[in-house]
Regions:
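Short, surface-exposed connector motifs at secondary-structure boundaries
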Residues: 110-116, 183-186
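N-terminal [4Fe-4S]-dependent radical SAM core
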Residues: 1-64, 70-85
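Core AdoMet radical
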Residues: 51-71, 75-98, 113-126, 142-170
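Generic structural signal for well-ordered alpha-helices
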Residues: 65-72, 101-106, 130-134, 171-174, ...
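Acidic (Asp/Glu)-rich catalytic clusters
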Residues: 75-79, 105-111, 131-143, 175-179
Length: 206
């Protein structure tokens, strides 16, 4: 972070970690979310589209290898990147059979991939998935990171946006993940209509 910036940019953090520009490659998997199938709710979060949250997202009709190759080619050429993070982004990526989870991760092992990021919900963090990630990290030498959707610490706002969990589940998930040493990225939506400035500050504190 330079003296003129008020926060540490994610892109700067990646440059410091890997020594050069790094871009995320989204991987679209045929999965779903417990907030859609009735396990903890229906309809999903109010901000989530039919494909789950996503950017540069290709159809999951493509194989994982084809999604990876196409986006590495496109993003690498457009932004001059040579290193990439394979990003399991849409829906809840620890809400699938464990063997499928392991296989999908193996399919993104690629010479240009330096990290695998798993996006999920705080209430879907289970030991067997964390153990599988640790085993694969040790086996492949690739970094594994986990991205948790919190969105806000305000319980009433969480209810309004139909998240289906509260702050307690998030804190429990962080403690579980920390035992394995994985880096955690927290997703927040600032200035939701039901939040105020105090909520935004409390988000940052948490």
């Amino acid at each position: 972070m330079n003296s003129e910036e008020l926060y540490n940019k994610y892109s700067t953090n990646l440059k410091q970690k890997y020594g050069e520009k790094v871009y995320k490659i989204p991987i679209n998997l045929p999965t779903t979310c417990p907030n859609r199938d009735g396990t903890c709710g229906v309809g999903g979060c109010i901000f989530c589209g039919t494909e789950g949250a996503g950017f540069e997202l290709l159809s999951n009709k493509y194989s994982i290898k084809k999604q990876l190759d196409k986006n590495i080619g496109y993003i690498g050429k457009r932004y001059g990147a040579k290193k990439f993070i394979a990003y399991f982004q849409n829906f809840t990526n620890t809400y699938m059979p464990i063997e499928d989870f392991k296989q999908y991760i193996r399919e993104v092992i690629h010479p240009s991939v330096v990290e695998i990021a798993i996006s999920t919900r705080p209430d879907c963090i289970h030991e067997e998935y964390l153990e599988a990630l640790q085993d694969l990290e040790n086996e492949t030498g690739l970094r594994m990171s986990i991205e948790l959707g919190l969105q806000t610490i305000n319980y009433h706002t969480l209810s309004k946006i139909n998240r289906g969990h509260g702050l307690a589940e998030f804190l429990d998930a962080v403690l579980r993940i920390k035992k394995y040493g994985f880096e955690i990225c927290t997703h927040l939506i600032l200035n939701l209509p039901w939040d105020n400035q105090r909520d935004v500050i409390e988000n940052a504190k948490v």
